[in-house]
Amino acid sequence: MLKHICLLSVVIFFAACRDKGKGDLLDEMASREINEPYEPIFLQDTAVASLEKVTIKDKYYRTAIEREVVNFYKKYNYQTRWLYQNKPSPLFASYIKTLTELTDYGFFPQNYRQHELDSLVGHLYQHKDSLFLKQLETTDREITASFLLLTRHLTQGRIPKVGDDVRVWKRNKPIFDNVELLLKLKDTDNLSTVIEALQPQQAFYKAMAQKYKELLKDTTSYTPFAITDLKSFAVGYSDSTVVALRNQLGLRGYKPVAQGAPAEVDSLLIEAVKQFQRQVGLTADGAPGALTMSYLQMTPKQQSDLLLLNMERLRWQNKDLGEDYILVNIPEYRLNLYHKDSLKFTTKIVVGKPDTPTPIFSDSLKYVEFRPTWSVPISIVRREMIPRIVDSGDSLKYAKRGYKLYENNKEIDPATINWRDEKTLRRNLAFVEDPSENNSLGLVKFVLHNDMSIYLHDTPSKKLFDNTQRTYSHGCVRVQYPDSLAYQLLKHTAEWNYQKVNDAMQTGRDQYRVHPK
């Protein structure tokens, strides 16, 4: 059963049950008592001003981390956590090791002062003097600040803001208490395992991390070029750039063996281009145009940077997605439904225009509604519909298309409105489109709980799915095969089979809402 939805810059998720592997570890830690240090050293200086004096290499989180450091030592009875009288705790060594391992996930140890802290601790125990305890306290606080910053980055992301439009990026609220986590950690805990549990647990996140690790070692060089005469690119076309195209496809794992001269285009080469286009989400037309070539010639560094950004976005929406979820890849314009990380259904989508982008957030599925009406958002009424009525001079422009006009919940005749009056733009006018196959939302919509009126829906504009770039909506996600999606969502609900879904769309009652079980 699908419950939760998570919209990301790259993906949208619909999730169900929690990931038990991740949840069991964190739940077990949450149930613990506060860890008692093996060799407690009580802080000599417990003033808030002193505890807040830590180095944090992140301006955005600095104030929050300072507060967390103070909170931690207060709850920990003002004792050192990482450093004991005669040696560092095993947890410190584990932390230094873990920071190195996190480079495989695109984290940079220097941001958490790995070498600096390791050196400070080593020097501290080798050169004990009258200031030893004071320096030990200070260093312990610095390690705590480093750890709390890392856990922030793991669970909330490292990029504080992308773009100026708050509609585009809406993160999850934190689901982990980083201070409580540190309070419950034992010296015997495998910190690498704990840190792993804090990261997204989806198979595609782990696959991204594995690919990122491989790309860091990839030294392949790609020489930029373009097909000399793209319009003539077809079987029989001959040019030296065709040889270069074969070579670059070979570097990507495709082996278009020439049927004749290597410089001549043949059917196998065109098929290899199509296969590559399908892999990266482009229209598989076999023509190596500018967009196809930009993907084909992407360097390992460019690929790793893109993966790093996508992994970061997944961390922003770090949720347990469970066994059943839907991933909507916005740049690829595709929706994928998974069960236990196995792809079960896929379809094309249309997403928001550049000026009305599909926002990024996590949510849950509320219900499926068949034969919906469309209550046009007031922003669209004022910005688009009224100006079009004025330009056309036809007061009934939208009435002819099945829209009814309301003001203060009372239906009114659009012919009675002076659409050219500037005051009309300030009136509380509402257009509502009746259910039909021509309704802007089509015959079914998938309603979420968010406060932005963003949902998935059918569309009468089916031809848009033939385009490679599909950014045409006002922010909602249009689905090419909504009937199949509805079936996938409702098939575990009593009596809902594909035929019943089709009947509900074509001949069922209007605004029929079904809550998935």
What are these regions (language model features)?
Residues 18-76, 148, 165-168, 189-517:
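Well-ordered beta-sheet/strand-loop patches within structured domains
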Residues 99-102, 150-155, 185-186, 249-252, ...:
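Generic structural signal for hydrophobic core residues of well-folded globular domains
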Residues 10-11, 359:
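Proline-rich low-complexity regions
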Residues 18-174:
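Cationic-aromatic interfacial patches
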Residues 162, 182-184:
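Charged, long alpha-helical assembly modules
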Residues 2-8:
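Sec-dependent signal peptide recognition
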Residues 13-16:
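C-terminal motif of bacterial Sec signal peptides marking the signal peptidase cleavage site
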